[in-house]
Amino acid sequence: MHEIRKTEEFKVWLDSLKDLIGRAKIQARIKRLAEGNQGNTKSVGSKVFEMKIDFGPGYRIYYTKHESVMYLLLIGGDKSTQNKDIQQAKHLAKNI
């Protein structure tokens, strides 16, 4: 099992989701990441990865890897905020 840590920004985003089914799907996806299944993931640069959840508005989780065993969930968003979220995730990753 890989260790998963969450930034405050990520926690606030996840807790603010009104879509309870979407939130449950995101939490299930995080569990699969902890089990080593990265799934539908791509690099967006600066050691930041985008994990796509094919549900609702197209949820995304932005994360970075540390020491090859721990994932730090930086921020979440959806397709409509993708560009802004990527920039914020890169900024957060750079400053940890």
Q: How should these model regions be labeled?
A:
Residues 28-55:
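A short, surface-exposed loop/turn module that caps and links secondary-structure elements
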Residues 1-31:
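Solvent-exposed, charged helical/coil patches
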Residues 17, 33, 72-74:
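Generic leucine side-chain signal with a strong bias for well-ordered alpha-helical environments
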Residues 3-4, 12, 23, 38, ...:
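Enriched for short, Lys/Arg-rich terminal
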